[in-house]
Design a protein with these regions (language model features):
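Basic, nucleic-acid-binding surfaces and adjacent catalytic neighborhoods in DNA/RNA-processing proteins
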Residues: 1-132
């Protein structure tokens, strides 16, 4: 959950390899990690005080991208996307984190192959056709 939020705050793609980060991206990621974790620690302390949370969950309605698949990104309004791998899921904003490009997960992109949308605009156009 927090990794999705940290990467969104740092404006980094969830598939970017750490060995390819520039020095500036490393600093940005470090600050985003500190800021995001500090913010959530404070929020959770305010909610629970000295007690233990009633419900332990990774899905919180006020998160920017985690658990918000297909909902609008609070920063740019683009539809939050996800990558599913085995039992794990990563949520990201294609516009804020990936220059508007959609990332392919193993299951759906293999099924769709050539029909997999390349960017957010292509996906939105297809969704509009389905709705009509």
């Amino acid at each position: 959950a927090y990794s999705d939020e940290i990467l969104h705050c740092a404006r980094l793609s969830p598939v970017k390899q750490t060995k390819t980060l520039s020095e500036n991206e490393e600093r940005t990621l470090f600050r985003a990690t500190q800021n995001t974790l500090t913010m959530w620690i404070q929020r959770l302390r305010q909610e629970t005080g000295t007690g233990f949370p009633e419900k332990v969950t990774a899905f919180r309605k006020d998160m920017a991208v985690h658990g918000r698949y297909r909902l609008p990104c609070p920063e740019c309004g683009a539809s939050v996307q996800r990558i599913v791998y085995a039992q794990n899921e990563a949520n990201y904003c294609p516009r804020c984190q990936n220059d508007g490009k959609l990332l392919a997960d193993r299951s759906l992109s293999r099924l769709l192959k050539k029909n997999w949308p390349k960017n957010l605009e292509e996906l939105e156009m297809r969704n509009q056709r389905v709705v009509k």
